[in-house]
Amino acid sequence: MERLIKLAEQIKDEELRKKVIEFLKNPKATHPGIVDTGISVEEAPASINWHHRYEGGLIEHTISVTKIALKMADVLEEVYGVEVNRDYIIAGALLHDIMKPYNYIRKEDGTFDHYDMFNLDHLTLAVAELYKRDFPIEVIKIVASHHGDHSPTRPNSIEAYIVHYADEADSKINDVAVRVCQARSRDLGISEQEIYKAVNPLKVYEVRSREGKLKTIEFLKDILKSIGIISEDEKKDENNESLENKESN
């Protein structure tokens, strides 16, 4: 959470900065009908079946989206000479998924799932809470439209498009990475979540894209062995089996 607050402190407008920091520190739904599932922003994944689907994924995704969006703002100003409101970008990016924890529960095995009693979706909850907390309409529109054409309202400002495409870029690249981790977890006969405890999925994808499948398996075995997730005997058995596999994924 401190990393999110540090980004929020870059907001120049004092009133907006205070509102964003307060929301980050107290991301609770005001309406009494919204069920608190007990999942914090710090522990929540960013999704269940897609990108950042591991503990801490939501914060990781939020930081990345905010930083990507600010870099995009730099490029658009430098190349096209437009003025971009960075305060709105930071606020919208930091808060775009802030209510996702209300859609998740933690299962007995420690993994996450959707809350089956169904709170409102995270976008609806966020927009409602932003209205309740009297945020600027420009920030509300950024959050409301961050899914682009799949949002209830489409982006209608440079800032809204920046946040939307920053969100999409980070989501897409992480989704590719977690699918590689999913495949390698099957190769290793372990839970996909065990990989995420040991190494960031983008690092796994980096190894996969540069060195191939077999090197990725070896990379993961070494890391997993070092933290006790697999034993030396398991590593030897898997080494022998891997040598028989063809480079196919």
UniProtKB/Swiss-Prot annotation:
Pfam families: HD. Its EC number is 3.1.4.56. Residues 58-172 form the HD domain. PROSITE patterns: HD. It catalyses: 7,8-dihydroneopterin 2',3'-cyclic phosphate + H2O = 7,8-dihydroneopterin 3'-phosphate + H(+); 7,8-dihydroneopterin 2',3'-cyclic phosphate + H2O = 7,8-dihydroneopterin 2'-phosphate + H(+). It comes from the Archaea. The keyword Zinc applies. GO terms for molecular function: GTP cyclohydrolase IV activity; metal ion binding. Gene3D superfamilies: Hypothetical protein af1432 (1.10.3210.10). Pathway: Cofactor biosynthesis; 5,6,7,8-tetrahydromethanopterin biosynthesis. CDD domains: HDc (cd00077). PANTHER family: 3'-5' EXORIBONUCLEASE YHAM (PTHR37294:SF1). Cyclic phosphodiesterase that hydrolyzes the cyclic phosphate of 7,8-dihydroneopterin 2',3'-cyclic phosphate (H2N-cP) and converts it to a mixture of 7,8-dihydroneopterin 2'-phosphate (H2N-2'P) and 7,8-dihydroneopterin 3'-phosphate (H2N-3'P). Is also able to utilize other phosphodiesters as substrates in vitro: hydrolysis of bis-pNPP and pNPPC produces nitrophenyl phosphate, and that of 2',3'-cAMP produces 3'-AMP. ATP, 3',5'-cAMP, GTP, 3',5'-cGMP, and 4',5'-cFMN cannot serve as substrates. Homododecamer. This is Dihydroneopterin 2',3'-cyclic phosphate phosphodiesterase.
